[in-house]
Amino acid sequence: MIPGEIITAAGEIELNAGLETVTIEVANSGDRPVQVGSHYHFAEANPGLLFDRDAARGKRLDIPAGTAVRFEPGQTRQVTLIPLSGKREVFGFRQQVMGKL
């Protein structure tokens, strides 16, 4: 073994396997790019993003941890969301929940 080496199991790892998903269309109505991180409560994302916020309540992007999706000005794209897990409590962000979902 080499110091710092990572030895992984054979095969592929499926992220977020078995979680319920919802796909929504998101449009950036602003004049600047907006980036949303993997674990951000999507319903509280930048108000310049236009989408069904009720459908996004309690959900985050279905992307690898530590990554983000960028919405360029005027861009419309579809994203897939998965439920937030754990205690399902949301604090901070834009302070629209501040407690249990």
UniProtKB/Swiss-Prot annotation:
Pfam families reported in the protein's UniProt record: Urease_beta
Protein keywords: Cytoplasm, Hydrolase
Swiss-Prot/TrEMBL GO biological process terms: urea catabolic process
Keyword set includes Hydrolase: yes
Catalytic reaction equation(s): urea + 2 H2O + H(+) = hydrogencarbonate + 2 NH4(+)
Top enzyme class: hydrolase
CDD domains linked: Urease_beta
EC numbers, comma separated: 3.5.1.5
Subcellular location field: Cytoplasm
Gene Ontology CC entries for this record: urease complex
Primary location: cytoplasm
Gene Ontology MF, one: urease activity
PANTHER family linked: UREASE
HAMAP family (UniProt xref): Urease_beta
Subunit field text: Heterotrimer of UreA (gamma), UreB (beta) and UreC (alpha) subunits. Three heterotrimers associate to form the active enzyme.
Family in the record: Belongs to the urease beta subunit family.
Protein name: Urease subunit beta
